[in-house]
């Protein structure tokens, strides 16, 4: 199976302005996303994963009517772009997305999906105290249920935040309970690959406790990188792509 991975658009088109971080080219995103989708189609990937921060929704006064209307319009724009793909697309929200608007536009994949030889699980987590992400409640229950599944499918787990490695200097990117999550996942041996975004420099594919972990670099920042993973071999291969 060939899996496309792209993350952190921080798009603004209907929403005014741009990200407060000038390196994030929020207003260029519709054109750039379209180019990445074209490449995914050319590469004939079997599915595409988008690991959050679809839109750069304003944090302050995030629920005022104007921001809600334009934020939803921007999510719809991204959905329309992704609809050009002729393969399954898995999207989770990030800390810069409005969770309720995301649910309205994309809905949540709370049931797993099978693509090829893999069962794909999406997890929708939140930041907690001091902006530290944590998997709790229903998402934690779904995680434990997934990792203890005894069927024949290997699993791919999709989330915005990092399970591994620990990247918390300057800003907390890694789950507060990452150690226990990895321990649970590795003990049952069901999880082959865990994909994340959030940490803009990204992290290359690495194997730890029997699981492959990868963090996509932010697509919103030049050279607008994205990846394709080839899972057809025992050792997963990464193809690094960008728009430069």
Q: Which residues does each PLM region occupy?
A:
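Core catalytic region of metal-dependent phosphoesterases/phosphodiesterases
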Residues: 28-115
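Acidic, histidine-bearing metal-coordination/catalytic regions of metal-dependent phosphoesterases
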Residues: 1-47, 76, 85, 232-244
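Binuclear metal-dependent phosphoesterase catalytic core
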Residues: 184, 202-244
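His/acidic metal-ligating clusters that form di-metal
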Residues: 36-48, 119, 132-212
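Divalent metal-coordination and catalytic microenvironments
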Residues: 8, 48, 53, 94, ...
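Short, flexible/disordered intra-domain loops and linkers
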Residues: 17-26, 60-71, 167-173
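Active-site environment of divalent metal-dependent phosphoester hydrolases
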Residues: 10-17, 56-59, 95-102, 128-131, ...
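Beta-strand-turn-beta hairpins that frame and shape the catalytic cleft
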Residues: 1-5, 13-16, 112-122, 150-156, ...
């Amino acid at each position: 199976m060939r899996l496309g991975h792209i993350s952190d658009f921080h798009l603004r088109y209907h929403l005014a302005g741009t990200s407060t971080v000038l390196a994030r080219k929020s207003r260029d995103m519709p054109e750039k996303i379209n180019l990445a989708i074209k490449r995914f189609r050319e590469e004939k990937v079997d599915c595409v994963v988008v690991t959050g921060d679809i839109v750069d929704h304003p944090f302050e006064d995030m629920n005022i009517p104007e921001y809600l209307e334009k934020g939803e319009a921007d999510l719809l724009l991204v959905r329309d772009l992704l609809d050009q793909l002729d393969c399954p697309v898995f999207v989770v929200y990030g800390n810069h997305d409005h969770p309720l608007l995301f649910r309205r536009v994309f809905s949540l994949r709370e049931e797993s999906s099978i693509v090829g030889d893999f069962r794909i699980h999406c997890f929708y987590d939140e930041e907690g105290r001091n902006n530290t992400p944590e998997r709790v409640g229903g998402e934690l229950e779904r995680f434990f249920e997934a990792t203890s599944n005894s069927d024949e499918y290997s699993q791919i787990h999709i989330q915005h935040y990092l399970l591994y490695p620990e990247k918390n200097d300057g800003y907390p990117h890694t789950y507060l309970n990452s150690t226990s999550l990895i321990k649970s996942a590795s003990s049952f041996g069901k999880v082959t690959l865990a994909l994340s975004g959030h940490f803009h420099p990204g992290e290359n594919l690495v194997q730890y406790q029997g699981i492959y972990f990868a963090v996509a670099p932010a697509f919103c920042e030049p050279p607008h990188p994205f990846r394709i993973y080839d899972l057809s071999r025992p050792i997963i291969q990464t193809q690094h792509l960008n728009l430069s």
